[in-house]
């Protein structure tokens, strides 16, 4: 078990109870982080000829399992190595978005006009999670969070797992392609809170429409389609 690199219990409690008072925004924050990861891969594709992805290839997927009481947000973005999981998720309030924006600005400043395809798009890359705390909003609704990630260009996948209290573990995992899955194991329902409602088609679609319409990439989710069945007249 690894320990958070800050006063985790106090700071995590402060973030959950003070910074975020509206529990349902956890999904907005996870989708924002997924959008970050996709942005980073798209940026890499503009400057690295070995990364062949187009904007239309990139997407975010939201899923749920009502029996297991889980909500999953997945992306096919840049992914994270073991060290990056430790750095980005092990340090509360650390954000690599600032570092990414600095690298983005440096690349744009050093490039010649027309040097890289679509380099003008660099100024249009949105970085949402600048403060590095949004991910931890998942612990407002989750008793455990598991992050499975595989970095672009790597054959290895790693899983970061924590209950938000006693530190975290990082272990080898399996993932077919680059990207990240964030699985939130919902807390048990109480007299005041019905966390299980988040693990439903209706609950998630409402939150996506309410909070995440600004995301530039497609947000996919399997939905149940119903149709009227004609009954024969007697």
Name the predicted role of every residue range.
Residues 201-217:
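Short, cationic low-complexity segments
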Residues 153-155, 227-230:
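Short, surface-exposed beta-strand/loop "edge" segments at domain boundaries and coil↔beta transitions
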């Amino acid at each position: 078990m690894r320990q958070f690199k800050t006063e985790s219990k106090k700071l995590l409690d402060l973030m959950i109870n003070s910074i975020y008072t509206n529990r349902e925004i956890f999904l907005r924050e996870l989708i924002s982080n997924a959008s970050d990861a996709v942005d980073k891969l798209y940026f890499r594709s503009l400057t690295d000829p070995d990364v062949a992805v187009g904007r239309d290839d990139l997407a975010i997927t939201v899923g749920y399992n009502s029996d297991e009481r889980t909500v999953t947000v997945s992306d096919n973005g840049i992914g994270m190595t073991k060290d990056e999981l430790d750095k980005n998720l092990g340090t509360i309030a650390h954000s690599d978005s600032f570092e990414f924006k600095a690298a983005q600005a440096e690349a744009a400043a050093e490039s010649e006009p027309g040097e890289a395809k679509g380099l003008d798009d660099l100024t249009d890359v949105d970085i949402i999670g600048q403060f590095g705390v949004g991910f931890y909003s998942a612990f407002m609704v989750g008793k455990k969070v598991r992050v499975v990630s595989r970095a672009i260009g790597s054959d290895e996948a790693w899983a970061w797992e924590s209950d938000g209290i006693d530190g975290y573990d990082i272990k080898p995992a399996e993932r077919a392609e680059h990207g990240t899955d964030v699985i939130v194991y919902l807390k048990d329902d109480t007299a005041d809170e019905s966390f299980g409602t988040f693990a439903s088609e209706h609950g998630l679609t409402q939150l996506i429409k309410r909070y995440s319409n600004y995301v530039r990439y497609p947000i996919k989710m399997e939905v149940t389609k119903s149709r009227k069945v004609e009954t024969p007249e007697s």
